[in-house]
């Protein structure tokens, strides 16, 4: 059974909390287990917590959960691109899969709500599939 870590942004907790619950359910359905969850204030802080989990020998991969809503500036775009690049870099550096379960940028609250199930499932599925490849 694959042992996964999960990092959850608590910003927009009404959305990310539900995404987190659904991700845990999806992992069980897939025959994997989320063994450690780290909550962080916002999506910007996700990469540091991911690194902490990747350094643990008993963690096979990491699921990330967050949502970045559209604001009045391009801040959401800048943050989303920086996070995606850093997560990809960490995955390659540690040789363990890291998912991008962060909805956004450039989405509204309503759009984020509609994506809860899909993004939570994809976040788990991508890590599990990478661990089971070959």
What kind of region is each of these model predictions?
Residues 36-44, 104:
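Short beta->alpha junction loops
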Residues 79-104, 122:
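Short, acidic/small-residue loops that bind anionic groups at enzyme active sites
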Residues 117-134:
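A charged, well-structured terminal subsegment
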Residues 8, 64-68, 99-103:
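Short beta-strand segments
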Residues 48-86:
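Glycine-rich phosphate-binding loop
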Residues 105-118:
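Phosphate-binding/catalytic loops
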Residues 1-39:
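Glycine-rich phosphate/diphosphate-binding loop of Rossmann-like nucleotide-binding domains
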């Amino acid at each position: 059974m694959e042992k996964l870590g999960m990092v959850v942004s608590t910003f927009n907790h009404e959305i990310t909390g539900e995404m987190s619950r659904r991700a845990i359910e999806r992992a069980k359905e897939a025959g994997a287990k989320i063994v450690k969850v780290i909550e962080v204030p916002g999506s910007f802080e996700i990469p540091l917590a991911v690194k902490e989990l990747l350094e643990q020998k008993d963690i096979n991969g990491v699921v990330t959960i967050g949502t970045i809503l559209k604001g009045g500036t391009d801040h959401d775009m800048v943050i989303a691109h920086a996070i995606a690049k850093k997560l990809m870099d960490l995955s390659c550096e540690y040789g363990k899969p890291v998912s991008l379960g962060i909805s956004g940028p450039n989405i509204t609250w309503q759009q984020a709500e509609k994506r809860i199930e899909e993004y939570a499932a994809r976040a788990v599925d991508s890590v599990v599939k990478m661990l089971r490849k070959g």
